[in-house]
A protein has these predicted regions:
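Conserved catalytic/acceptor-binding region of the Class I
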Residues: 27-95
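A short SAM/SAH-binding and catalytic strip from SAM-dependent methyltransferases
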Residues: 1-10
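Core SAM-dependent methyltransferase catalytic element
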Residues: 76-79, 96, 144-155
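C-terminal helical/coil "lid" or tail adjacent to the Rossmann-like core of SAM-dependent
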Residues: 82-142
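Short conserved AdoMet
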Residues: 7, 21, 78
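Amphipathic alpha-helical interaction segments
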Residues: 68-72, 126, 146
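A short glycine-rich, Lys/Arg-flanked "PGG" loop and its adjoining helix->strand segment in the class I
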Residues: 10-25
């Protein structure tokens, strides 16, 4: 699962298609952070990944790439392209594991995101902490709708 971090996903997919044997299947997990739904207590916490997407984009990472993968696989020549939704949420996943993921992101990105959004590191950390608190609260829901996409090389 790397397409959101590849500078030129169509070129990557075209190369994957070229390398596959006829009839071979390409399968990947694609991320789309708009599918990350957290019942955070503040508007800033709820908007976190919507606000940071334009900041991350110039680094070559596309946080909303998941929705484009179907089209891109078809455009480079894959056949029988399918989307397999995967929901990871607080009803089927450990809240502690989900919160740990957000803590890793917070600890790795707070300073960068704060600088590029014109916020203080404390304000950016508070956005992540709001999401983490919601994930850990058994009365709140959080989930991530991920997409696994597959396509077959023509025979």
């Amino acid at each position: 699962h790397v397409l959101q971090a590849v500078g030129d996903p169509p070129a990557f997919l075209a190369e994957a298609l070229r390398l596959l044997a006829p009839g071979g299947v390409f399968y990947t997990l694609v991320e789309d952070y708009q599918g990350l739904v957290v019942d955070a207590s503040t508007e800033a916490g709820r908007r976190l990944f919507l606000d940071v997407e334009p900041v991350i984009r110039p680094t070559g990472t596309h946080l909303h790439h998941g929705r484009q993968a179907f089209r891109e696989l078809r455009a480079v020549g894959f056949e029988d392209v399918r989307v397999h939704p995967i929901v990871v949420d607080t009803t089927n996943t450990s809240r502690a594991t989900f919160a740990r993921m957000l803590r890793f992101w917070r600890d790795g990105y707070v300073d960068f995101l704060a600088e590029h959004l014109g916020e203080t590191p404390a304000a950016m950390k508070a956005r992540f902490d709001d999401q983490i608190a919601a994930v850990e609260d058994p009365e709140r829901y959080a989930g991530w709708w991920l997409l696994a996409v597959s396509g077959r090389k023509p025979a």
